[in-house]
């Protein structure tokens, strides 16, 4: 009897410890759980920062930025070697076409004018991906990965969408939507850089 009580207590303690470890490995951002460490195509990445994108008073999505090592400036993020990920989880339903247009405008507002002609093929592909989705619903996630040797991989609900976009300039242009000189949301920029 005493042995089964000890065994039961040990099992409960192990379960509690495992639950604590699992919760310690995540960050809660507006009810969305983001892992502090992830694996992207064989590369170990850590959460650099995460926050919420607001439009007026409305929460639109959470965003998380993953890198191989911490970076505190946009320049450090763009120059960081290896794989990178931006993860977006919707906090409200949104027309996917509208989101695609906002991303395109964000790229235009934050990219050097002499780079825009190089970015057009990637922007057209991204617009096509969002057009096919029609609607992104609350809780749905998409990721934008930079994988050296492959390119930018956009996944919606965990499913890669088409072939990678090879040019790193395209991934950098997308990152500048949030970290550029005219970011989508200044507070989100600071959060992604780990400043909040």
Task: Walk through the language-model features, giving the residues of each.
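N-terminal signal peptide c-region/cleavage motif recognized by signal peptidases
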Residues: 19-22
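Mid-length scaffold segments of soluble, non-membrane domains
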Residues: 71-149
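Cysteine/selenocysteine-centered motifs that mediate thiol-based redox chemistry or coordinate metal-sulfur cofactors
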Residues: 186-196
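Short strand-turn-strand beta-turns centered on an Asx-Gly dipeptide
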Residues: 156-159
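Flexible glycine-rich active-site/ligand-binding loops centered on an Asp-His dyad
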Residues: 163-188
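N-terminal secretory signal peptides
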Residues: 25-80
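Bacterial N-terminal signal peptides that target proteins for export
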Residues: 2-11
């Amino acid at each position: 009897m005493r042995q089964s009580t000890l065994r039961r207590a040990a099992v409960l303690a192990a379960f509690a410890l495992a639950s604590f470890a699992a919760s310690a490995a995540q960050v809660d951002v507006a009810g969305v759980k983001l892992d502090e460490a992830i694996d992207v195509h064989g590369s170990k990445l850590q959460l650099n920062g995460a926050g919420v994108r607001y439009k007026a008073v409305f929460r639109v999505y959470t965003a998380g930025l993953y890198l191989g090592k911490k970076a505190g400036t946009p320049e450090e993020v763009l120059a960081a070697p290896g794989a990178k990920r931006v993860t977006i989880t919707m906090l409200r339903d949104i027309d996917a076409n509208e989101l695609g247009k906002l991303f395109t405008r964000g790229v235009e507002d934050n990219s050097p004018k002499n780079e825009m002609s190089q970015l057009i093929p990637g922007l057209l592909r991204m617009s096509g991906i969002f057009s096919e989705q029609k609607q992104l619903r609350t809780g749905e996630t998409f990721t934008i990965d930079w994988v050296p040797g492959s390119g930018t991989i956009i996944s919606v609900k965990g499913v890669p969408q088409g072939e990678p976009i090879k040019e790193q300039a395209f991934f950098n242009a997308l990152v500048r939507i949030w970290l550029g000189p005219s970011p989508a949301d200044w507070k989100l920029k600071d959060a992604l850089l780990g400043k909040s």
